[in-house]
Amino acid sequence: MPLIEVDLLNPTAASEAKAHKMKRLVPTPNSYFLEIKCPKCGATTTTFSHAHRQILCQKCGQPLGQPTGGKLKLTQQCKFRIKK
């Protein structure tokens, strides 16, 4: 009968995602790049997920996202995808 019920050498993907970025088995960042599509003109803008400034559309100037001190908060009509 094992004393520990959790395998420390082979953690599950769910437990790795919950762990702090420096305490994971292989340290990985929490940030990523986004492609945001403007709902007004359809242009795509590439930005960082933790941007510190307001993101505006490059063509029409409509605001696409607001900084929150952490992750970027997108406007409700914007569609996005994570770049890999």
From Swiss-Prot:
A single Gene Ontology CC term: cytosolic small ribosomal subunit
Pfam families attached to this UniProt entry: Ribosomal_S27e
Tree of life domain: Eukaryota
GO molecular function, one term: RNA binding
ZnF segments: C4-type: 38-60
Primary location class: cytoplasm
GO terms (BP aspect): ribosomal small subunit assembly; translation
Keywords: Cytoplasm, Metal-binding, Ribonucleoprotein, Ribosomal protein, Zinc, Zinc-finger
Compartments where found: Cytoplasm
Keyword hit for Zinc: yes
InterPro entries: Ribosomal_eS27 (IPR000592), Ribosomal_eS27_Zn-bd_dom_sf (IPR023407), Ribosomal_zn-bd (IPR011332)
Cofactor note text: Binds 1 zinc ion per subunit.
Cofactors required: Zn(2+)
Tagged with keyword Zinc: yes
Family, as annotated: Belongs to the eukaryotic ribosomal protein eS27 family.
Function according to Swiss-Prot or TrEMBL: Component of the small ribosomal subunit. The ribosome is a large ribonucleoprotein complex responsible for the synthesis of proteins in the cell. Required for proper rRNA processing and maturation of 18S rRNAs.
Self-association and partners: Component of the small ribosomal subunit.
Protein name: Small ribosomal subunit protein eS27
Organism: Entamoeba histolytica (strain ATCC 30459 / HM-1:IMSS / ABRM)
